[in-house]
């Protein structure tokens, strides 16, 4: 079966989110997301946290290892935070910890089963932070060779777990990107064009975001295959608007209670320009940090519900607009479908 036929026709029929008028493409049978327990339709996603973390290990690619922590301890520490998020209405949790920083697909599956929450993991390599988290072969292999590694995880699963990634996670520092960071972005685009997985890029600044977008589109991927992660770090709102107007996803995903007013202002600006459908919101919270006693201080996943949603209501955002932000947008962003330049189905 051809890869496009598999992606577009082999998935279960989509179930529209209740009370929402979805984009036309969501009515097609290709609207599916890959979780650690297998594929589900977008109608099963519910409220989504599109950028969070369960476990991280900042030791570096040369020393990171699952032997540095006890999975049972991490499970016991983190499960109550997921249960708290579940009580607040979260149905789907996107874990953005990549390989070489502590990605543990088996742990995520255990937590998914115990919490009743859908969880999504990733493939890809993280080139930010001075490229501390890259394996040596990231410098010697071509973009095509790196993409082959990531595509293999989509086809065969991560390690011996059988668990498949639901998106691509990579990362870069500020503009200008290094040669290796540019290669990672190209590898991500090549992987997308073979798998339909969306590309989440930790991004140092707005000019780096536009550089990423140029690489992706030059490689043949459409802008809506790309998420500008940590866009809140860029103070120039014009760059947010430029990326959104191009069709990319602009993610304000470092929510703290003290930043709520800034997030409301960002969303109000997008709404005024009819670009609310390009926004993603999350906390970048958690996590169990390997090497710290008891995993260190864990930040809960609930400020969105306790702080941001009440502020959005006060600012005049309707129920439909809030569902757009926390259900429809992440469902569209995560849906597995190949988005080619000049053939984007985004509406």
Regions picked out by a protein language model, each given a short descriptive name:
Residues 1-7:
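Twin-arginine (Tat) signal peptide motif
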Residues 7-22, 26, 31-37, 302-347:
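Mid-to-C-terminal alpha-helical segments outside catalytic/metal-binding sites
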Residues 46-50, 60-118, 144-163:
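Alpha-helical scaffold segments that flank or form the walls of functional sites
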Residues 51, 93, 192, 250, ...:
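Divalent metal-coordination and catalytic microenvironments
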Residues 106-108, 178-183, 207-220, 237-244, ...:
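Distinct, well-ordered alpha-helical segments
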């Amino acid at each position: 079966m051809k890869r496009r036929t598999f992606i577009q026709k082999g998935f279960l029929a989509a179930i529209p989110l209740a009370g929402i008028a979805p984009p036309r493409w969501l009515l097609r049978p290709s609207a599916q997301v890959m979780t650690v327990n297998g594929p589900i339709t977008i109608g099963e996603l519910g409220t989504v946290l599109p950028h969070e973390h369960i476990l991280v290990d900042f030791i570096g690619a040369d020393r990171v290892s699952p032997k540095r922590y006890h999975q049972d301890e991490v499970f016991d520490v983190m499960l109550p935070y997921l249960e708290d998020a579940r009580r607040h209405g979260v149905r789907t949790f996107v874990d953005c910890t990549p390989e070489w920083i502590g990605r543990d697909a088996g742990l995520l599956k255990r937590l998914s089963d115990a919490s009743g929450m859908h969880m999504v993991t990733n493939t890809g390599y993280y080139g930010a932070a001075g490229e501390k988290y890259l394996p040596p072969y990231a410098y010697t292999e071509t973009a095509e060779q790196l993409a082959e590694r990531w595509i293999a995880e989509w086809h065969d699963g991560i390690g011996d777990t059988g668990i498949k990634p639901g998106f691509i996670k990579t990362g870069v520092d500020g503009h200008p990107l290094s040669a290796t960071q540019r290669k990672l972005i190209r590898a991500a685009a090549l992987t997308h064009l073979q798998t339909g997985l969306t590309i989440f890029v930790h991004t140092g600044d707005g000019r780096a975001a536009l550089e990423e977008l140029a690489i992706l589109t030059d490689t043949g991927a459409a802008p809506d295959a790309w998420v500008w992660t940590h866009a809140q770090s860029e103070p120039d709102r014009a760059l947010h608007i430029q990326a959104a107007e191009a069709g990319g996803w602009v993610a304000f995903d470092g929510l703290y209670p003290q930043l709520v007013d800034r997030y409301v202002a960002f969303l109000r600006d997008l709404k005024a320009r009819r670009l609310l459908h390009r926004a993603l919101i999350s906390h970048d919270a958690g996590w169990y940090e390997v090497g710290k006693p008891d995993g260190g201080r864990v930040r809960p996943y609930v400020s969105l519900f306790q702080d941001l949603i009440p502020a959005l209501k006060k600012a005049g955002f309707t129920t439909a607009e809030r569902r757009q932000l926390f259900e429809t947008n992440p469902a569209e962003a995560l849906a597995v479908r190949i988005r080619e330049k000049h053939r984007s189905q985004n509406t």
